[in-house]
């Protein structure tokens, strides 16, 4: 599933082609996604794009009459293509632009979303989200306060959008390794110093992944069709049985609630 770096990479890739251009019309080939494509999107006509923003894993296209909310789901990607390029099997939605380009949404598993809202504030998919991990609001003091009475393991807590948004399975595993914290540690057992380190590491890992265009494991592609290259820098995720790059101990993989967790027994305590 695309996580925050992949969504931010998509945002940065499509923004220069959309802002200042006008959506002439939308083409919806298959509106049966995780939620049905909003009827307002079918009827889009002559709508200039004012901005392309991101909140958590949602892309937000600001138009004069409202907002398009896009979620990439498990396997979705957005590409900027020439208008004349014919669609393929899993190309479900196009925004045809005034500059001769098309924003094309591809989603083999159809678990993404294209929604419409007049006002962002209060929309149900955005209403209960925690702070952005790259913002000043997410810091060691905040994390320590939120962990203090939490009797659950730190890794699933990091992946809870009510704590902080966009830290999915890959980046939770990588950040905990970089901070030397075992993923099964109780959140309440973390000291303030550990929380300060973990908050800094999460920011650093996410920023590095954004620099590398995100992580491509299977489906994700950048807006220009290229993969994300952070997969080449993964320290533990997807490396079961391979030697730790720090100490040489084989990486361990466990599964909790259908989620794979990767860690080093030696480096993470």
Swiss-Prot record:
Known catalysed reaction(s)? Hydrolysis of DNA containing ring-opened 7-methylguanine residues, releasing 2,6-diamino-4-hydroxy-5-(N-methyl)formamidopyrimidine; 2'-deoxyribonucleotide-(2'-deoxyribose 5'-phosphate)-2'-deoxyribonucleotide-DNA = a 3'-end 2'-deoxyribonucleotide-(2,3-dehydro-2,3-deoxyribose 5'-phosphate)-DNA + a 5'-end 5'-phospho-2'-deoxyribonucleoside-DNA + H(+)
- Keyword Metal-binding among UniProt keywords: yes
The record's free-text note on cofactor binding = Binds 1 zinc ion per subunit.
What are its E.C. numbers? 3.2.2.23, 4.2.99.18
Which Pfam families does the protein's record reference? Fapy_DNA_glyco, H2TH, zf-FPG_IleRS
| Record key words, sorted | DNA damage, DNA repair, DNA-binding, Glycosidase, Hydrolase, Lyase, Metal-binding, Multifunctional enzyme, Zinc, Zinc-finger
What are the coiled-coil residue ranges? Answer: none
Q: Name one GO biological process term.
A: base-excision repair
Q: Which cofactor does it need?
A: Zn(2+)
Q: Which residues form the active site?
A: 2 (schiff-base intermediate with dna), 3 (proton donor), 57 (proton donor), 259 (proton donor)
Give any GO molecular function from the UniProt entry: class I DNA-(apurinic or apyrimidinic site) endonuclease activity
Q: Does this UniProt record's set of keywords contain DNA repair?
A: yes
FPG-type Zn finger ranges: 235-269
Binding-site residues, DNA = 90, 109, 150
> InterPro entries from the xrefs?
DNA_glyclase/AP_lyase_DNA-bd, DNA_glyclase_Znf_dom_DNA_BS, Formamido-pyr_DNA_Glyclase, FPG_cat, MutM-like_N-ter, Ribosomal_uS13-like_H2TH, Znf_DNA_glyclase/AP_lyase, Znf_FPG/IleRS
Report the sequence similarity comment from the record: Belongs to the FPG family.
On assembly, the entry states: Monomer.
Q: What does this protein do?
A: Involved in base excision repair of DNA damaged by oxidation or by mutagenic agents. Acts as a DNA glycosylase that recognizes and removes damaged bases. Has a preference for oxidized purines, such as 7,8-dihydro-8-oxoguanine (8-oxoG). Has AP (apurinic/apyrimidinic) lyase activity and introduces nicks in the DNA strand. Cleaves the DNA backbone by beta-delta elimination to generate a single-strand break at the site of the removed base with both 3'- and 5'-phosphates.
Q: Could you tell me what this protein is called? A: Formamidopyrimidine-DNA glycosylase
């Amino acid at each position: 599933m695309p996580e925050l770096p992949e969504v931010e990479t998509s945002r940065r890739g499509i923004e220069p082609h959309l802002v200042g251009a006008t959506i002439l019309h939308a083409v919806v080939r298959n509106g049966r996604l995780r939620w049905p494509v909003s009827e307002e999107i079918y009827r889009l006509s002559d709508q200039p794009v004012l901005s392309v923003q991101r909140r958590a894993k949602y892309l937000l296209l600001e138009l004069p009459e409202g907002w398009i909310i896009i979620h990439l789901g498990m396997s979705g990607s957005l590409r900027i293509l020439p208008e004349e390029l014919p669609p393929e099997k899993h190309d479900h939605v196009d925004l045809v632009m005034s500059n001769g380009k098309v924003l094309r949404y591809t989603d083999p598993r159809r678990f993404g979303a294209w929604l419409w809202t007049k006002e962002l504030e209060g929309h149900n998919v955005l209403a209960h989200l925690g702070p952005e991990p790259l913002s000043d609001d997410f810091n060691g003091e905040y994390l320590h306060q939120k962990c203090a009475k939490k009797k659950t393991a730190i890794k699933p807590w990091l992946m809870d959008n009510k704590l902080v948004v966009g830290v999915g399975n890959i980046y939770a595993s990588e950040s905990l390794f970089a901070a030397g914290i075992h993923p099964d540690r109780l959140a309440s057992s973390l000291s303030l110093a550990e929380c300060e380190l973990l908050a800094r590491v999460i920011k650093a890992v996410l920023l590095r992944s954004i620099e590398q265009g995100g992580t491509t494991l299977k489906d994700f592609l950048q807006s220009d069709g290229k993969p994300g290259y952070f997969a080449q820098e993964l320290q533990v995720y997807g490396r079961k049985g391979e030697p730790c790059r720090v100490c040489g101990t084989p990486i361990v993989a466990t599964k909790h609630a259908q989620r794979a967790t990767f860690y080093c027994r030696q480096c993470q305590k």
